[in-house]
Curated annotation (Swiss-Prot):
Low complexity bias: start-end ranges: 769-788
InterPro entries, A to Z: GCC2_Rab_bind (IPR032023), GRIP_dom (IPR000237), PH-like_dom_sf (IPR011993), Ran_bind_dom (IPR000156), RanBP1-like (IPR045255), TPR-like_helical_dom_sf (IPR011990), TPR_2 (IPR013105), TPR_rpt (IPR019734)
Phosphothreonine: residues bearing it: 14
GO biological process, one term: NLS-bearing protein import into nucleus
Stretches forming TPR repeats: 51-84, 575-608, 639-672
Composition-biased stretches (Acidic residues): 1302-1314
Additional record remark: One of the 8 copies of RANBP2 clustered close to the chromosome 2 centromere.
RanBD1 domain mapped to chain residues: 1021-1157, 1318-1454
Residue span(s) of domain GRIP: 1685-1735
Annotated protein name in UniProt: RANBP2-like and GRIP domain-containing protein 1
Keywords for the protein's UniProt record, in alphabetical order: Phosphoprotein, Repeat, TPR repeat
Pfam families: GRIP, Rab_bind, Ran_BP1, TPR_2
C-alpha cells in the first residue's frame, strides 16, 4: 500500500508540474511575476524542450530588467523552434539596450537585418551600434543612411536622421542642400516631423556664421525656402495639433515674415514668394480663428467669424505671384499651385461666412480694416507678451482693402489648380464639393477628374461588368457626387442639433474633420494607385478586389444597397451636367448614364408604394431617413424619369420619338422642350423655304411653339411652384414668345416681307445657314437667338454715351457691351448643342457682331440655291472679314448667320435719289469702312440701306438674288458704279490700309469704331512699344475642305517584312471633303506633334474589313501619301467602342456613295492621243529584254518630246494630253498628270510652261470660261472654246498630300526647280548650321539594325532601350573602338561606350541571336555601369557582330585598324517607289535575276567602275538601271568608258584563265579610281533605296566564280597585267609569283569585290521593280483618263439641263436661283454675269440661235 501510495503521489506531483505553465500564465495576468516565474521553472523541470515556456520565462526576466537571463531564455527558445523570427529582433534589441560590446549585439543585429530588410527597428539598432564607435562609426552611419535612402527615399525618419547628422557635425550647408533636394518628395512634404526639421535647419543656417560669410543671393534663397516651409508646416499643424501649438507656430511664422520684409527690394524670387506667403499667413490666421471657435459659444462665434472674414478678405485680395521671377519650372509650378489653393480656400470661405447675411463683408471691412481692428485681430491671435510693433501682423497696412466678393467663374478656375496642390486628396475634393453644393452652379467635378486622370475614358460601354479595367470618369464622378451628398446630409443633421447662427456650415479645410468614411477613402486610394500604377508589387490583386467590389454599387448593379434618394440625386445631377456640355457625344454619355439610374430607380419606386426599402448593414453610402422618398413624390419622380428618356431620344436625333414622349407628359418641362424642338424645326425650314407648302409648314411649327410657350406662362400664373421646375427663368420664356409672335406676324398675308412668293427675301439676301441634317440641339442658349425688329432703347442710349466719351478722350475706347446684351440672349443653363462639322455656320454672340467668312464652308453672304443644293460644292469664299456697319443699322445674329433688317423697298445700289436722303457730307470719311449705312430717320419713304459712292463699298460678286419690293437698282445714274466688277475678290474692302479686318469673335461692339469717329480724332496714331512681326498665316492644307467625320483612334500599319501590325500613332481620324472637286479623303495627324500618319483618297474600290479578334477595328488598303509620295499601305484603325467603329463604317460608305453622285467640278475634257499606250507597250517589252526599255529611256526621249510638242499644237485635244518631260538630272521619265490647272491665259493653244497650283480662292486670278457668252452676238448664244492649260505647277504640294486633280493612284515625284522660277519665302530660314555627330574621325567597322535592351536591377527585368543602327566605330588617330547606337528618328543615344579587353559577349539563354555584355556606358552623359543586350533579326548578322567585336579588342591591343564589315542586309531606307511595288512584280524580276550567265555577267561586271559609293541620294527621283541584263546593246550605253577592268565570260581575252581577265585601270586626272580598286572603308557599296531582299542564288553564283581568285587591283598608276592560263585538264600555271602575304591580301580584296557585285545585282533588281511600278502607274492613269471623260460628259449633260430650265422658266426668283450654278460652272466674267442677271430679271430677252 505504501508503494502504491508513493507512486500515486508522484504521479500527482508530476501532473501538478505539468499544469505549472498554465498557472504561470494566470499569475502573469494577475501581475504576480515572481509566482509566475516559480511555476514556469517548475514546468521546465519536467518539460525542458518546450520553446513556449522558455520564451515565457524570458519575458518574465525582461520585466525584471535581467537582460542577460532574458537573452539566454530567448536564445534557447529560438534553438528549439527556429521559425520564431521575432525573437531574433528581440534579442538584438536587448543586447543593444544593454550596451554589449563583445560583438554579440552586432551579430544579432546583422542576423535580424537579413530577416527584416528595410525595417525601421533594424535601422535604429544599427544607428545605435555605429554611434558607439565614435568618428569611424559616424562615417559608416552616413554611408549606410545614404544607401538606405537610395532604396527608400520616402522614409521620413531616415531623412530627418541624415539632416540631424549634418547638423550635429556643423555641416549646415549640406543639411540645407538635403532639405532643398527632398522638398520635391510629396510624402515628405505631407509629414509634420519633416517640415519641423526643415524649419529648424533653415533657421539655424540663417543664424549661423556660415550664412553671413556667403553671398547675399544665398541668404535670400534660404529665406525663400524658410517661408515656404513655414506655410506648409502651418497647414499640417492646424490639421493635427491643438490650438496652443498652432498659435505658437503662427507667431513664429509672423517673425519670419517680418525678418524677410526688411530685405525686400525689386522684382526677385524672394519678393514674389513673400507676397504669396503673406496671403497664406492671413488664410491660416482665419482658419486658426475658426478653430478656436469650435469650443466657444454663440457670442464668441460671432466675434471670431468676423475677424476670420477679415483675414480671408485680405488673403483673397493678395494678387497671384509673378511666377516668371521664380527660378526653375518646379518652383514656378509649386508657387502657382499654392496661389490657386489660397484663392480657392479663401474665396469659398468668404462665400461660406457671408451666406444669408446681407452686406456682411462690407460691414466687416468698415469695422476692422483700420488700426483698431488690427489690434483686435493681433490680440485674438497672439499672446500679450509679444510686441505688436515688431510683428508683421501689427505693422502690416490693411487699410486699403476693398469689398470684393469672389466670382464663381474665378473660383472654378482656382479649384482646378488647387486640386494639383493636394494631389487628388478625397478630403479636399469632398470639401470643394460641399462648398459648391450650396451655390447655384454645379461643381466642375468633370474638370477635376480630367486634371487627375488624363487618359481615363469618360464612359464605358460595359456597364454590366465590374472589372477594374472598365472604370471611367463617370464612375468616379458618381462616386464623388455620392460622397458629397452624404457628407452634406450628415453636416446638416449635426447643425440642426447644436449649431450657432454665426458658425459656418463647413469649417476650413485644415480644421474640419474627416468628411468621408474609411471605406470610401480606401476605395478612392485603391483606384488612384491602380490608375497611376503605383501599387507595391504583390499588392495589386488586393487593390483590384477592393475596386471591383464597389464598382457594382456605383453602377447600381445587383444588391447595390443604395438609397433611392441617392439614385435620384445622381440621375438629376448627371442630366443637369449633360445639358451644359457642348459636345453631343458628351451629352449622350451623361444623359445616357442618367437614364441608366432612372431605370434602376423606377422599380424601387414601386416597392416604396408598398413598403420601405431595407437598409444594408455597412453601406458604401450611408442612408439618411430625412431624405426618404415619400409616396406622394413618386408620381413626380416617374414623370422626371420619362422626361429624361425623351431628352435622350432628342440628343440621339430621334426627334419624332422625343416629340411623342414629350406630348404624353403634361408638364411645363415637356412644354418647354417641345417649344424648343418645334422652333428649331421652323428655323431649319425657314432657311430654305421656297415653295408655299414649305412656308406653311414653317408657320405651323411656329404656331405650335407659340402654343406651348403660352401653356407654360398660363401654368406658371395659376401655380407659382411650377416655375421652379423650369430649366430656364420665366423671363426667357416670355422673351422667346415675343420673338415667335413677331415671326408669325411677318408671315401674315400681304405683309411687308411676303411678296412675289418670296419668303423674307430682305433677310435671306445675305443670310445663309446650313442646318444640321441629323440632330437637333436642345440648348436655347446655343440654338435660339433672336433680335427685335427695331433697335432697342438701350442701344440708342449706348451709342450716345459712347460718342460723348469719344469726344472727351479723343481716342478709340473699347467698350464691353456683353452685360447690356445679356438680357437679349437665351440663358445658358440648358442642353448643349450637337457638335457640327466645319462649314456649319455657328451663331454669333451679339447683335451686329462682325463675322468672319470661313473658307471651309459656304459663306454667310451667299444664299444657297435650293435647286442645286447637292451640287453647291464649288469655290469656297475668300478668307475675308466683313467690315462693320454703323450702330444705326440694326444687325440680326441668329443661328442662320448674318442678316440685315431692311425695309420693304429693299436694297438700293449706287447714289440714292436727292429727295430721299439727307446729305451728310460731300464724301465719306477717309477711315470709313465699306459698309456705310446712312441715317434713315429723316427719310420720308425708307429705302433700306444705301451702297456705293466709293470703291470701298460692297461688291457683291456672286450674289444674284433680288430683294423683295423694287428689287435691284444697278445705279445707272451713278457713273462710278461698276456693277458686279471684281468677281471673286473680297466682298467687303476698305480704303484704309491700316484698318485690319479682324474677326470679332466675342460678339461685342469692341471694334465698332465708326460711332467713335470725330473730326479731331481722325489723325490719332498710337505707336506700339514693341513692333510686332508680320503675321504669317498658318496653312494646314485643309483650308478648302469640310470635315465630315472626326474621331480619336489608334492607327496601325501592316509591316510586310516582319508580317506584323505596327502602331502608327494616336490622334483624330478625319474624313475631309474637298469643296472644289467634292472628293473625300482620309487624314490623320498624331497628337501633339501633328505629324501626318494617314493621308489618302477614299475610292469606290476600297473595302473595310473587320480586324480579326476585335469588334472595334477596321482595316483597309489604300495608296497613302503620309510620307509625301504614294505608297500602298494596309492600315487599321482601332476605336474606343464598337459603336464608334460602326459609325465610322457608315460614314465611310456614305462617302463612297457620295463619289458616285458628284460630277466632275472642272468641266474640261481629257483626250488620250495614244502616246500613253505606246509607253505601256514599250514598257511591256521589258519582260523579254530590259535592254529595249533602257534604249527607250536614253535614245527615245527626243521622240517623246517631239510627239508632245506636236500634240500640243492640235488645240484643246493636245492641251489635254498627259505630258512627259525629261528631267535633266534623271534619265528616267517623270510623269506629270496631277497638275491640271485652269489659267488666265487658257485660250492660248500652246501648253503653258508654268501655272499656279493653288486653291481656287478669290485671291487667284480670274479664270476664263470654257462655255463663253460671245459679246458680239445678240441674245443668248454659246460658243465653246478651249480653256484648259495643263502645266507643271511650281508650287509644292501641301504637306497633307492634297492636290486638285491628283488621282489616288498617282505616285510621281515632281521637282519644281526645273521650271526656273524663284519664289521669295514668307518666313526666311535661319542660316544653315553644320551638324556634328562626333563620329567624323571614325570609321564604321560594323553597322546593322538591332534592338537594344538594358537590365533594370530594381524590377529585375530587361527593358527596351531603343531600336536603331548599332555601330562599331574605330578612331583613326588612337585606334580606340567604341559601340554607338542611336534610336530611330529621334537619334537619341542609347549606347555609347568603349570596347575594353576585359569585355566579353555572352549568349542569352534560349536564343542565339542575342548578345549580352556589361559596360560603363555614357549614353546619358554620365558614366554608368549597365548590363546591355542586343538582338538581331538574323543569325549571321549576330555572328558577324560577335566576330567584329572580338576583332576590335585585338585591334586595340595591336594599335591597328580593323577591316570594315559591309552588312549584306543593310538597314532598309525609304523608297520613292515603295516596297509594295517590288512585291507586286516579284515574279517578273525573279525571271531575270535568278541565273547569271555568259554575256550578262560580263555586262554586269562592266558596271562596277561606274557604280557610285555614295550612301545617300539627295533627290527622291527614280534612278535608271545601273546594272542591265543584255548583250551588245548595253555596251553602247557605256561606250565612253575607257576600259572594262573586270569582265566575266569573255572567251577571247588574251591570256585569260577560267575566262577571267584582270586589268588595273589608270587613274584619270578628274576622277578617283573605281570603288572596287579601293581598300579599307572606301570599298563599301551601299545598295540604293529600292532594295530587294538577298538572293541566295545570285550570291552563290558569283561567289563560286571568284572563290579561288588570288588577283586584285593594285593601286599603282601603271597598267600591270596578271595572266593565268590553264591547259585543258591540267592544273593552272602561274606566270607571276607572289608571297603568301600578298596572296592572302589579294584574295581578300577579290572576295570583297564579289560582295560588291552582289550588291549591284540586287540594286538592278530593285531598279527593274521601279520600272514595273511606273508601268502600273501608266495603266492607272489611262483608267483615270477614261473615267474623267465619262464624268465630263455627265457634267455637260447636267449643265445643259440647268440652262434649258433657266431658259424656259419665267423671269424672277426661280431664274435667279439658278444664277450661282451657271456662274460657277461656266466661269463667267463680270460683264457676262451682268447680262445673265438682266436676262433672269426679264430686262433682256433670251435669244437662241437657230440652226442653219
Amino acid at each position: 500500500m505504501n508503494v502504491m501510495g508513493f507512486n500515486t503521489d508522484r504521479l500527482a506531483w508530476t501532473r501538478n508540474k505539468l499544469r505549472g505553465f498554465y498557472f504561470a500564465k494566470l499569475y502573469y495576468e494577475a501581475k504576480e511575476y515572481d509566482l509566475a516565474k516559480k511555476y514556469v521553472c517548475t514546468y521546465l523541470s519536467v518539460q525542458e524542450r518546450d520553446p513556449r515556456a522558455h520564451r515565457f520565462l524570458g519575458l518574465l526576466y525582461e520585466l525584471e530588467e535581467n537582460t542577460e537571463k532574458a537573452v539566454e531564455c530567448y536564445r534557447r527558445s529560438l534553438e528549439l523552434n527556429p521559425p520564431q523570427k521575432d525573437l531574433v529582433l528581440k534579442i538584438a534589441e536587448l543586447l543593444c539596450k544593454n550596451d554589449v560590446t563583445d560583438g554579440r549585439a552586432k551579430y544579432w543585429v546583422e542576423r535580424a537585418a537579413k530577416l527584416f530588410p528595410g525595417s525601421p527597428a533594424i535601422y535604429k539598432l544599427k544607428e545605435h551600434l555605429l554611434d558607439c564607435e565614435g568618428e569611424d562609426g559616424w562615417n559608416k552611419l552616413f554611408d549606410w543612411i545614404q544607401s538606405e535612402l537610395y532604396v527608400r527615399p520616402d522614409d521620413v525618419h531616415m531623412n530627418i536622421r541624415l539632416v540631424e547628422l549634418y547638423r550635429s557635425n556643423k555641416r549646415l550647408k549640406d543639411a540645407v542642400a538635403r532639405c532643398h533636394e527632398a522638398e520635391r518628395n510629396i510624402a515628405l512634404r505631407s509629414s509634420l516631423e519633416w517640415n519641423s526639421c526643415v524649419v529648424q535647419t533653415l533657421k539655424e543656417y540663417l543664424e549661423s556664421l556660415q550664412c553671413l560669410e556667403s553671398d547675399k543671393s544665398d541668404w535670400r534663397a534660404t529665406n525663400t525656402d524658410l517661408l515656404l516651409a513655414y506655410a506648409n508646416l502651418m497647414l499640417l499643424t492646424l490639421s493635427t495639433r491643438d490650438v496652443q501649438e498652432s498659435r505658437e507656430l503662427l507667431e513664429s511664422f509672423d517673425s519670419a515674415l517680418q525678418s524677410a520684409k526688411s530685405s525686400l527690394g525689386g522684382n526677385d524670387e524672394l519678393s514674389a514668394t513673400f507676397l504669396e506667403m503673406k496671403g497664406h499667413f492671413y488664410m491660416h490666421a482665419g482658419s486658426l480663428l475658426l478653430k478656436m471657435g469650435q469650443h466657444g459659444n454663440n457670442v464668441q462665434w460671432q466675434a471670431l467669424s468676423e475677424l476670420a472674414a477679415l483675414c480671408y478678405v485680405i488673403a483673397f485680395q493678395v494678387p497671384r505671384p509673378k511666377i516668371k521671377l521664380i527660378k526653375g519650372e518646379a518652383g514656378q509650378n509649386l508657387l502657382e499651385m499654392m496661389a490657386c489653393d489660397r484663392l480657392s480656400q479663401s474665396g469659398h470661405m468668404l462665400l461660406n461666412l457671408s451666406r444669408g447675411k446681407q452686406d456682411f463683408l462690407k460691414e466687416v471691412v468698415e469695422t476692422f480694416a483700420n488700426k483698431s481692428g488690427q489690434s483686435v485681430l493681433y490680440n485674438a491671435l497672439f499672446s500679450s507678451q509679444s510686441s505688436k510693433d515688431t510683428s508683421f501682423l501689427g505693422s502690416d497696412d490693411i487699410g486699403n482693402i476693398d469689398v470684393q466678393e469672389p466670382e464663381l467663374e474665378d473660383l472654378a478656375r482656382y479649384d482646378v489648380g488647387a486640386i494639383q496642390a493636394h494631389n487628388g486628396s478625397l478630403q479636399h475634393l469632398t470639401w470643394l464639393g460641399l462648398q459648391w453644393n450650396s451655390l447655384p452652379a454645379l461643381p466642375g467635378i468633370r474638370k477635376w477628374l480630367k486634371q487627375l486622370f488624363h487618359h481615363l475614358p469618360q464612359e464605358t460601354s460595359r456597364l454590366e461588368t465590374n472589372a477594374p479595367e472598365s472604370i471611367c470618369i463617370l464612375d468616379l464622378e458618381v462616386f464623388l457626387l455620392g460622397v458629397v451628398y452624404t457628407s452634406h446630409l450628415q453636416l446638416k443633421e449635426k447643425c440642426n442639433s447644436h449649431h450657432s447662427s454665426y458658425q459656418p456650415l463647413c469649417l476650413p479645410l485644415p480644421v474640419c474633420k474627416r468628411l468621408c468614411t474609411e471605406r470610401q477613402k480606401s476605395w478612392w486610394d485603391a483606384v488612384c494607385t491602380l490608375i497611376h500604377r503605383k501599387a507595391v508589387p504583390g499588392n495589386s490583386a488586393e487593390l483590384r478586389l477592393v475596386v471591383q467590389h464597389e464598382i457594382n454599387t456605383l453602377r447600381a448593379q445587383e444588391k447595390h444597397g443604395l438609397q433611392p434618394a441617392l439614385l435620384v440625386h445622381w440621375a438629376k445631377c448627371l442630366q443637369k451636367m449633360g445639358r451644359g456640355l457642348n459636345s453631343s457625344y458628351d451629352q449622350q454619355e451623361y444623359i445616357g448614364r442618367s437614364v441608366h439610374y432612372w431605370k434602376k430607380v423606377l422599380p424601387l419606386l414601386k416597392i416604396i408604394k408598398k413598403n420601405s426599402i431595407p437598409e444594408p448593414i455597412d453601406p458604401l453610402f450611408k442612408h439618411f431617413h430625412s431624405v426618404d422618398i415619400q409616396a406622394s413624390e413618386i408620381v413626380e419622380y416617374e414623370e422626371d424619369a420619362h422626361i429624361t428618356f425623351a431628352i435622350l431620344d432628342a440628343v440621339h436625333g430621334n426627334i419624332e420619338d422625343a416629340v411623342t414622349a414629350f406630348e404624353s407628359i403634361k408638364s411645363v418641362v415637356s412644354y418647354w422642350n417641345l417649344a424648343l424642338i418645334f422652333h428649331r424645326k421652323a428655323e431649319d425650314i425657314e432657311n430654305d423655304a421656297v415653295f408655299p407648302e414649305e412656308q406653311e409648314e414653317c408657320k405651323n411649327y411656329l404656331r405650335k411653339t407659340r402654343d406651348y410657350l403660352i401653356k407654360i406662362i398660363d401654368d406658371s400664373d395659376s401655380n407659382l411652384s411650377v416655375v421652379k421646375k423650369l430649366p430656364v427663368p420665366l423671363e426667357s420664356v416670355k422673351e422667346m414668345l415675343k420673338s415667335v409672335m413677331q415671326e408669325l406676324e411677318d408671315y401674315s398675308e400681304g405683309g411687308p416681307l411676303y411678296k412675289n412668293g418670296s419668303l423674307r427675301n430682305a433677310d435671306s439676301e445675305i443670310k445663309h445657314s446650313t442646318p444640321s441634317p441629323t440632330k437637333y440641339s436642345l440648348s436655347p442658349s446655343k440654338s435660339y437667338k433672336y433680335s427685335p425688329k427695331t433697335p432697342p432703347r438701350w442701344a440708342e442710349d449706348q451709342n450716345s454715351l459712347r460718342k460723348m466719351i469719344c469726344q472727351e478722350v479723343k481716342a478709340i475706347t473699347k467698350l464691353n457691351s456683353s452685360k447690356s446684351a445679356s438680357r437679349h440672349r437665351w440663358p445658358t443653363e440648358n442642353y448643349g448643342p450637337d457638335s457640327v462639322p466645319d462649314g456649319y455656320q455657328g451663331s454669333q454672340t451679339f447683335h451686329g457682331a462682325p463675322l468672319t467668312v470661313a473658307t471651309t464652308g459656304p459663306s454667310v453672304y451667299y444664299s444657297q440655291s435650293p435647286a442645286y443644293n447637292s451640287q453647291y460644292l464649288l469655290r469656297p469664299a475668300a478668307n475675308v472679314t466683313p467690315t462693320k456697319g454703323s450702330s444705326n443699322t440694326e444687325f440680326k445674329s441668329t443661328k442662320e448667320g448674318f442678316s440685315i433688317a431692311v425695309s420693304a423697298d429693299g436694297f438700293k445700289f449706287g447714289i440714292s435719289e436727292p429727295g430721299n436722303q439727307e446729305k451728310k457730307s460731300e464724301k465719306p470719311l477717309e477711315n470709313d469702312t465699306g459698309f456705310q449705312a446712312q441715317d434713315i430717320s429723316g427719310q420720308k419713304n425708307g429705302r433700306g440701306v444705301i451702297f456705293g459712292q466709293t470703291s470701298s463699298t460692297f461688291t457683291f460678286a456672286d450674289v444674284a438674288k433680288s430683294t423683295s419690293g423694287e428689287g435691284f437698282q444697278f445705279g445707272k445714274k451713278d457713273p462710278n458704279f461698276k456693277g458686279f466688277s471684281g468677281a471673286g475678290e473680297k466682298l467687303f474692302s476698305s480704303q484704309c490700309g491700316k484698318m485690319a479686318n479682324k474677326a470679332n469673335t466675342s460678339g461685342d461692339f469692341e471694334k465698332d469704331d465708326d460711332a467713335c469717329k470725330t473730326e479731331d480724332s481722325d489723325d490719332i496714331h498710337f505707336e506700339p512699344v514693341v513692333q510686332m512681326p508680320e503675321k504669317v498665316e498658318l496653312v494646314t492644307g485643309e483650308e478648302g475642305e469640310k470635315v465630315l467625320y472626326s474621331q480619336g483612334v489608334k492607327l496601325f500599319r501592316f509591316d510586310a517584312e516582319i508580317s506584323q501590325w505596327k502602331e502608327r500613332g494616336l490622334g483624330n481620324l478625319k474624313i475631309l471633303k474637298n469643296e472644289v472637286n467634292g472628293k473625300p479623303r482620309m487624314l490623320m495627324r498624331r497628337d501633339q506633334v501633328l505629324k501626318v500618319c494617314a493621308n489618302h483618297w477614299i475610292t469606290t474600290t476600297m473595302n473595310l474589313k473587320p480586324l480579326s479578334g476585335s469588334d472595334r477595328a477596321w482595316m483597309w488598303l489604300a495608296s497613302d501619301f503620309s510620307d509625301g509620295d504614294a505608297k500602298l499601305e494596309r492600315l487599321a484603325a482601332q476605336f474606343k467602342t464598337p459603336e464608334l467603329a460602326e459609325e465610322f463604317k457608315q460614314k465611310f460608305e456614305e462617302c463612297q456613295r457620295l463619289l458616285l453622285d458628284i460630277p466632275l467640278q472642272t468641266p474640261h475634257k481629257l483626250v488620250d492621243t495614244g502616246r500613253a499606250a505606246k509607253l505601256i507597250q514599250r514598257a511591256e517589252e521589258m519582260k523579254s529584254g530590259l535592254k529595249d526599255f533602257k534604249t527607250f529611256l536614253t535614245n527615245d526621249q527626243t521622240k517623246v518630246t517631239e510627239e508632245e510638242n506636236k500634240g500640243s499644237g492640235t488645240g484643246a485635244a493636245g492641251a489635254s494630253d498627259t505630258t512627259i518631260k525629261p528631267n535633266p538630272e534623271n534619265t528616267g521619265p517623270t510623269l506629270e498628270w496631277d497638275n491640271y490647272d485652269l489659267r488666265e491665259d487658257a485660250l492660248d493653244d500652246n501648253v503653258s510652261s508654268s501655272s499656279v497650283h493653288d486653291s481656287p480662292l478669290a485671291s487667284s486670278p480670274v479664270r476664263k470660261n470654257i462655255f463663253r457668252f460671245d459679246e458680239s452676238t445678240t441674245g443668248f448664244n454659246f460658243s465653246f472654246k478651249s480653256a484648259l492649260s495643263l502645266s507643271k505647277s511650281p508650287a509644292k504640294l501641301n504637306q497633307s498630300g492634297t492636290s486638285v486633280g491628283t488621282d489616288e493612284e498617282s505616285d510621281v515625284t515632281q521637282e519644281e526647280e526645273r521650271d526656273g522660277q524663284y519664289f521669295e519665302p514668307v518666313v526666311p530660314l535661319p542660316d544653315l548650321v553644320e551638324v556634328s555627330s562626333g563620329e567624323e574621325n571614325e570609321q564604321v567597322v560594323f553597322s546593322h539594325r538591332a534592338e537594344l535592351y538594358r537590365y533594370d536591377k530594381d524590377v529585375g527585368q530587361w527593358k527596351e532601350r531603343g531600336i536603331g543602327d548599332i555601330k562599331i566605330l574605330q578612331n583613326y588617330d588612337n585606334k580606340q573602338v567604341r559601340i554607338v547606337m542611336r534610336r530611330d528618328q529621334v537619334l537619341k543615344l542609347c549606347a555609347n561606350h568603349r570596347i575594353t579587353p576585359d569585355m566579353s559577349l555572352q549568349n542569352m539563354k534560349g536564343t542565339e541571336r542575342v548578345w549580352v555584355w556589361t559596360a560603363c556606358d555614357f549614353a546619358d552623359g554620365e558614366r554608368k555601369v549597365e548590363h546591355l543586350a542586343v538582338r538581331f533579326k538574323l543569325q549571321d548578322v549576330a555572328d558577324s557582330f560577335k566576330k567584329i567585336f572580338d576583332e576590335a579588342k585585338t585591334a586595340q591591343e595591336k594599335d591597328s585598324l580593323i577591316t570594315p564589315h559591309v552588312s549584306r542586309s543593310s538597314t532598309p531606307r525609304e523608297s520613292p517607289c515603295g516596297k509594295i511595288a517590288v512585291a507586286v512584280l516579284e515574279e517578273t524580276t525573279r525571271e531575270r535575276t535568278d541565273v547569271i550567265q555568259g554575256d550578262d555577267v560580263a555586262d554586269a561586271a562592266s558596271e562596277v567602275e561606274v557604280s557610285s559609293t555614295s550612301e545617300t541620294t539627295t533627290k527622291a527621283v527614280v534612278s535608271p538601271p545601273k546594272f542591265v541584263f543584255g548583250s551588245e546593246s548595253v555596251k553602247r550605253i557605256f561606250s565612253s568608258e575607257k576600259s572594262n577592268p573586270f569582265a566575266f565570260g569573255n572567251s577571247s581575252a588574251t591570256g585569260s584563265l577560267f575566262g577571267f581577265s584582270f586589268n588595273a585601270p589608270l587613274k584619270s586626272n578628274d576622277s578617283e579610281t573605281s570603288s572596287v580598286a579601293q581598300s579599307g572603308s572606301e570599298s563599301k557599296v551601299e545598295p540604293k533605296k529600292c532594295e530587294l531582299s538577298k538572293n541566295s542564288d545570285i550570291e552563290q553564283s558569283s561567289d563560286s566564280k571568284v572563290k579561288n581568285l588570288s588577283a586584285s587591283f593594285p593601286m599603282e598608276e601603271s597598267s600591270i597585267n596578271y595572266t593565268f592560263k590553264t591547259p585543258e585538264k591540267e592544273p593552272p600555271l602561274w606566270h607571276a609569283e607572289f608571297t603568301k602575304e600578298e596572296l592572302v591580301q589579294k584574295l581578300s580584296s577579290t572576295t570583297k569585290s564579289a560582295d560588291q557585285l552582289n550588291g549591284l545585282l540586287r540594286e538592278t533588281e530593285a531598279t527593274s521593280a521601279v520600272l514595273m511600278e511606273q508601268i502600273k502607274l501608266l495603266k492607272s492613269e489611262i483608267r483615270r483618263l477614261e473615267r474623267n471623260q465619262e464624268e465630263s460628259a455627265a457634267n455637260v449633260e447636267h449643265l445643259k439641263n440647268v440652262l434649258l430650265q433657266f431658259i424656259f422658266l419665267k423671269p424672277g426668283s426661280e431664274r435667279e436661283s439658278l444664277l450661282p450654278v451657271i456662274n460657277t460652272m461656266l466661269q463667267l466674267s463680270p460683264e457676262e454675269k451682268g447680262k445673265l442677271a438682266a436676262v433672269a430679271q426679264g430686262l433682256q430677252e433670251t435669244s437662241i440661235p437657230k440652226k442653219k
